[in-house]
């Protein structure tokens, strides 16, 4: 439980004191050498610090390799804004710009719009009037003739192209024969595309000459 006391010899203590004195005598010499080494290191650092800024701006880009030059060109091209890359030869792009965004395209192409008078776009057919010769457009005919001209679109509403073997349904609307049969047989829709009345599959052929005369 209790620690034993160790009696130290006086000789050991004297030797330690002698060693400490010798170390203290050698210490100033080591301090002097350390100071000298520090001074030399500081002088070297100052020299290097003076030389480095002179050498840094003198590194021209011409000494860089071709790969580095190519990389610099790529970075400079990316930094430029508003420049487009050349298109690939195997890619073709078509751009369609709408110069009349306020005009109803369905009414302009076919002469019919499903929204009718509630459509928020303009119902204008100026371009279609230029294609078809107009005779005495300023004269106003009978009200019945005007109604007939307004009801008949100048193109098929289903395929949006010129009439091919046109037919008339029971409700009085005109379509292409192939378009009407495709809608009636394949899609199994027996109602009229314009007025949504039942047609029962009945259709009457219409003469193209008479149809072109009644169109606007």
Curated annotation (Swiss-Prot):
Pfam families assigned to the protein according to its UniProt record, in alphabetical order: zf-CCCH, zf-RING_UBOX
Gene Ontology MF terms in the entry: DNA binding; zinc ion binding
C3H1-type zinc finger span: 98-126
Zinc finger (RING-type): 156-196
Compositional bias per record (Low complexity), positions renumbered to this chain: 55-64
Keyword Amino-acid biosynthesis: no
GO biological process: generation of catalytic spliceosome for first transesterification step; snoRNA splicing
Transmembrane annotation, as ranges: none
Region (Disordered): 19-38, 43-68
A cellular component annotation (GO) from this entry: Prp19 complex
Highest taxon above the source species: Eukaryota
Role summary: Involved in pre-mRNA splicing.
Subunit text: Associated with the spliceosome.
Similarity comment: Belongs to the CWC24 family.
Protein name per the record: Pre-mRNA-splicing factor CWC24
Lineage: Eukaryota, Fungi, Dikarya, Ascomycota, Saccharomycotina
